[in-house]
């Protein structure tokens, strides 16, 4: 039997939503093995300063739990 776990990660990027989503997955890969899928749940822009907006994504990441 295979068991999966889901975590929700929020990441930001000054470049794009795509970069933010990839960053969320890459950072999760550094501490979690067997990632199976990722789904972008939400996107927004953080407007701390007009010159440097931050693209923010909320990503649900699923991975297989080892037995």
Name what the model sees in each region.
Residues 2-37:
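Short, well-ordered alpha-helical segments
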